[in-house]
């Protein structure tokens, strides 16, 4: 499936945002960067990304850091069974973080995403 075909499917659903996950999107940063850039140009959708990498390691890799420019929320870190916690929102283990990527890039430090379930 081409990037344009995926983009058309994403844009056809006006209510859903976008999640990049499984496998690991950071294994194919160029393709996901192309798709994320197109989504941001043509919609107001939020993009979440799940990765086994840490935010800090992604920043050190120029190809992966480029993708971060289009990501709104990053769930970083490998799932660790011994840290599993079913009470966490949007992640499976306590070592994984929810990161507000755009705020982090602006502040030049890691900024946690604050989920508000009441909204």
Name these PLM-found stretches.
Residues 13, 43, 52-53, 59-119:
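Auxiliary Fe-S-binding modules of radical SAM enzymes
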